[in-house]
């Protein structure tokens, strides 16, 4: 094989590896953004229901805690007393 052919094959392999790495990073970021949108939507819904009725929806709070994976720890104050 000629040196130019070897270089072309090596460049093709490197390009394929780079494409796999880039698309993997894009997919991971897409999942992170999608999860953040669901969290933001639930936060908005909980806030809206709290303003309307004076209390949060327990189901929404459970969904949020599953998404955040922190149990009932949330970035806002929760008065369960």
Curated annotation (Swiss-Prot):
Transmembrane feature ranges: 8-28
Name the Pfam families for this protein.
Vpu
Q: Which domain of life is it from?
A: Viruses
Question: Any keyword Membrane?
Answer: yes
Q: Write down which residues bear the modification named Phosphoserine.
A: 53, 57
Q: What else is known?
A: HIV-1 lineages are divided in three main groups, M (for Major), O (for Outlier), and N (for New, or Non-M, Non-O). The vast majority of strains found worldwide belong to the group M. Group O seems to be endemic to and largely confined to Cameroon and neighboring countries in West Central Africa, where these viruses represent a small minority of HIV-1 strains. The group N is represented by a limited number of isolates from Cameroonian persons. The group M is further subdivided in 9 clades or subtypes (A to D, F to H, J and K).
Which InterPro entries does the entry mention? Answer: Vpu, Vpu_cyt_dom_sf
Q: Where can this protein be found?
A: Host membrane
The residue ranges for the Cytoplasmic side of the membrane come to: 29-81
| The name this protein goes by in its record | Protein Vpu
GO molecular function terms attached to this record: CD4 receptor binding; monoatomic cation channel activity
GO cellular component annotations of the record: host cell membrane; membrane
**Bilayer topology term:** Single-pass type I membrane protein
The UniProt keywords, alphabetically, are: AIDS, Apoptosis, Host membrane, Host-virus interaction, Inhibition of host innate immune response by virus, Inhibition of host tetherin by virus, Ion channel, Ion transport, Membrane, Phosphoprotein, Transmembrane, Transmembrane helix, Transport, Viral immunoevasion
Q: What is known of its domains?
A: The N-terminus and transmembrane domains are required for self-oligomerization and proper virion budding, whereas the cytoplasmic domain is required for CD4 degradation. The cytoplasmic domain is composed of 2 amphipathic alpha helix that form a U-shape.
HAMAP family found in the cross-reference section: HIV_VPU
Gene name of the encoded protein = vpu
User: Can you tell me which family this protein belongs to?
Assistant: Belongs to the HIV-1 VPU protein family.
Provide the function of this protein.
Answer: Enhances virion budding by targeting host CD4 and Tetherin/BST2 to proteasome degradation. Degradation of CD4 prevents any unwanted premature interactions between viral Env and its host receptor CD4 in the endoplasmic reticulum. Degradation of antiretroviral protein Tetherin/BST2 is important for virion budding, as BST2 tethers new viral particles to the host cell membrane. Mechanistically, Vpu bridges either CD4 or BST2 to BTRC, a substrate recognition subunit of the Skp1/Cullin/F-box protein E3 ubiquitin ligase, induces their ubiquitination and subsequent proteasomal degradation.
Q: Name one GO biological process term.
A: symbiont-mediated-mediated suppression of host tetherin activity
The answer to keyword Chaperone applying to this record is no
Question: Which parts of the sequence lie on the Extracellular side of the lipid bilayer?
Answer: 1-7
Q: How is it modified after translation?
A: Phosphorylated by host CK2. This phosphorylation is necessary for interaction with human BTRC and degradation of CD4.
């Amino acid at each position: 094989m000629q040196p130019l052919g070897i270089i072309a094959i090596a460049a093709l392999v490197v390009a394929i590896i780079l494409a796999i790495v880039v698309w993997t990073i894009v997919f991971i970021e897409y999942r992170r953004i999608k999860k953040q949108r669901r969290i933001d939507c639930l936060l908005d819904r909980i806030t809206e229901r709290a303003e309307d009725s004076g209390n949060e929806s327990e189901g929404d709070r459970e969904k949020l805690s599953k998404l955040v994976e922190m149990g009932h720890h949330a970035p806002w104050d929760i008065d369960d007393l």
